[in-house]
Amino acid sequence: ITFSSPHYQYVKANGNVYYPSAKTGSSTSFVIPVEMNKNNSVVGMTTAMSTAHEIKYTIFVYIAEAAKANASARANGKEVTVIGVNGSDSSKTATANKKMDEVAPEIIGLEYQSETKAEYAKYFKIYHYDQGITLLEIDMNKKTGRKAAGKKWKEASEISGLNPAEQEQAALYLNKVIKYLIVPENAEIPAGLDKEVIVVRQPADHVYAGSNKTISLMEELGQLDKVTTVGVKKNKCKNETIKEKMAEKEVIYAGTSGKLNYKKLVKNKCNLALLSSSVLPEKRSSKKAAKKKMTAYRKMTEKMTLLQIPVIVDRAKDEKGKDAQKEWEKVYQVILGCDGQSAE
């Protein structure tokens, strides 16, 4: 293992202490035992910043070529994405997220099992892996005004307050296709995957529902009790149960999808935000309007990353036809952990 710093003095692993095997002016290397295809906990001691201190790391060690071979074996001539090999290389991650995958990606450390097919919907893909882990892909580009917005809206604010790791995570929201890893409460995922996918931990039981349609679908799926904040005011809410809860202050209005009240989200312990696609520019938007909308979207996702609240945009209304729109209930079933339930 090599650290990009010359200040590391030792590493603790498997109950033993290991000293540098090599050192340069900019790095320190150690030879340590690890278990393959499993998360390994190590502790490194560094004298950087004047004071000696230990830092705990989790590393996942694998043979990349084996993963690529597995992907090729089920590709049937199609391109297969391998998630977990790009690390912090955001340019490669962005390239892999320009379009939705036709074949389930190979995810380092996870075993692919099945796909929930979308017969009509065009803007999402759902792939299932072991441990009950699911990969959800959502197309954030097709039939939007994103192209008109240009590229300058992607430039992160210098006052965003995000550290380098958070900046990497926030950048995932700027991809044309966003990949989410839906992870059950007790499941363990390989270290480093959060650099390439947005991790949504279940249970998502303090949900912000950004629209009446989201509220309605959650009620049909029997998940209304998970809604704690909403994006519609009481006088515009069409759900009587939520209106009553708002009157009792059990459910709080936390701003619209395009203008969130972050303090209220934090106060109500929001752990998942389901936004309407109104946060994206419409296809015929002017350059100015599209840029303004995408800039606001970027700033919003930066803040939500800082607050550790995953954001999922519901593009059901952008689908063509009622059958395609209805199929988005499959997305809700996955993210809310109610796969066996169907909307009436």
Give the positions of each predicted feature.
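Sec/Tat-exported extracytoplasmic proteins
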Residues: S211, E219-G222, K269, S277, ...
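Short, ordered beta-strand-loop transition motifs
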Residues: A22-S26, K125-G132, M140
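Short Lys/Arg-enriched alpha/beta "domain-start" segment
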Residues: G87-A118
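Charged, glycine-enriched surface loops/patches
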Residues: R284-G337
